[in-house]
Structures are given as C-alpha cells and as structure tokens.
Amino acid sequence: MNFEEYRRHDGLGLAALVASGQVSAAELLALAIARVEAVNPHLNGLIHPLFDAARRRAGGRLQGPFAGVPMLAKDLFQEMAGAPHHMGNAGLRRAGVMADEDSELVRRWQAAGLVIFGRTNTPEFGAKGITE
C-alpha cells in the first residue's frame, strides 16, 4: 500500500483492510509516520512523537472496530501515561510535565484498537482556534 491508497479510506475502511489481512497495522503506521515526517516541518502539527510506543502497539494483537488504525491525539486534556502533557503552555513544557496515567478518552481510543503515534500542537489551554 502507498499513501495515495491509504488516504482513500476512512478509519473504518483502514480497519477493514487490517482485519482482512490486506495490510498490517505496522504498515499503516509506517505510512502515517512517513507522511507526518514529510509535512510536519511546514505545519508544526506534531509536537510529541510517540513512534516507538506506537510501533510496539501496532506489532501486538489489536482488537476493536478501529484495530490497527493510526491516530494523532491533541495535547489537550487527552493524557497519555508517560507522555508530555503541556496543553500549549510554555511553563508546563519547561517544567517537563508528564502524564501519570491515560485519560478515560485515551483508554477508550485504545480499547477501540487505535494506535496513537503522537501528540499534536494546541493553543494554550485550548483558548484560541489557532496555534502560533
């Protein structure tokens, strides 16, 4: 599969490809990571890559309606155990704040089989509709 084929599918379509064995979760993740690495220098969207943890998860047994589908999580109230959690705040970033546990939303995403491979930029505490 290449990225042009990947982008033709929504999340359920990608999950169906994984379930049928046409593509693996690891292959989808590799495509998603490659695309983010290509566009992120221009967008500054990905601020906390979690590629290694995502590769481990994608290589395991995944279940749920979105099993094997790569996803990015906003760095805003979606805590992931052991990952930076700054909510766009420079003070929290300088202090090196890390989440102690997964939020309920992250637990549900993971139970649905999603493979979170990074955290994305956010305006400070979500107060604006744009990031700088």
Predicted features, each with a name:
Residues 3-7, 63-69:
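Flexible N-terminal pre-Rossmann segment of NAD(P)-dependent oxidoreductases
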Residues 67-132:
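Short glycine/serine-rich loop/turn segments
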Residues 35-36, 54, 125-128:
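Short secondary-structure boundary/hinge segments and terminal tails
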Residues 58-62, 78:
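Glycine-rich loop at the start of a catalytic domain that most often binds anionic cofactors/ligands
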Residues 52-59, 110-114:
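Long amphipathic alpha-helix in the N-terminal Rossmann-like dinucleotide-binding domain
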Residues 1-48:
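An N-terminal boundary/leader segment
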Residues 15, 61, 106-107:
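Short glycine-/small-residue-rich flexible loop motifs, especially phosphate/cofactor-binding loops
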